[in-house]
């Protein structure tokens, strides 16, 4: 089977894609958590910035931090493992875009939870993607999950993103 011939490539690619998702979500959260830790809420909300401007700044800063972390991994993947993520072609951009939108949306939901529940919600900020990873079928097809978990997994965009990544790599 092509899947087993490309096992290293499939696992590495999914690991890189998941790392990008994790970085985009946690970068969004970290920027807001730093405001909580430094007790800088007063300065943040007194500044003449609209909420949309704060969200836009968090979004672009999270993208920049994600790219700084992921580009070296993509570059080093080929010389060390003989796998090139760039061979996926144009669909790679759409996969990264989908993961970034999901990560940023999750980051926005966690940030709203931090605003509502305070620092006690910090555990959710760190664990949200680790909780979703088994249901997101990052490293394996959805068919491996029990039927009742498949029903839950079908509600997550992650399943379809990683299934498509595996499909592109195998075919």
Residue ranges and their predicted role:
Residues 51, 56-124:
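Alpha-helical transmembrane segments and their short interhelical loops
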Residues 160-171:
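Transmembrane alpha-helical segments of integral membrane proteins
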Residues 8-78:
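Hydrophobic alpha-helical transmembrane segments of multi-pass membrane transport proteins
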Residues 114-155, 159:
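Transmembrane helix segments
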Residues 2, 22, 77-85, 115-119, ...:
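Short helix-capping/hinge motifs at transmembrane helix termini and TM-loop junctions
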Residues 2-34, 95-112, 132, 144, ...:
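Hydrophobic alpha-helical transmembrane segments of membrane proteins
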Residues 36, 45-49, 114, 118, ...:
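Short helix-loop-helix connector
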Residues 32, 44-45, 139, 143-146, ...:
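Transmembrane helical bundles of ABC transporter permease domains
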């Amino acid at each position: 089977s092509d899947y087993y011939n490309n096992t290293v490539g499939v696992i590495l690619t999914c690991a890189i894609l998941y790392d990008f998702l994790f970085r985009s979500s946690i970068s969004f959260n970290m920027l807001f958590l730093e405001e909580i830790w430094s007790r800088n809420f007063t300065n943040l909300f007194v500044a003449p910035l609209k909420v949309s401007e704060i969200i836009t700044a968090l979004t672009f800063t999270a993208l920049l931090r994600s790219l700084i972390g992921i580009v070296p991994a993509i570059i080093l993947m080929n010389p060390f493992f003989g796998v090139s993520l760039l061979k996926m072609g144009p669909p790679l951009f759409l996969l990264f875009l989908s993961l970034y939108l999901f990560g940023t949306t999750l980051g926005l939901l966690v940030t709203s939870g931090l605003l509502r529940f305070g620092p006690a919600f910090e555990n959710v900020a760190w664990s949200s993607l680790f909780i979703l990873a088994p249901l997101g079928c990052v490293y394996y097809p959805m068919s491996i999950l029990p039927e009742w978990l498949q029903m839950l997994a079908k509600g997550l965009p992650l399943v379809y993103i990683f299934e498509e990544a595996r499909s592109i790599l195998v075919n």
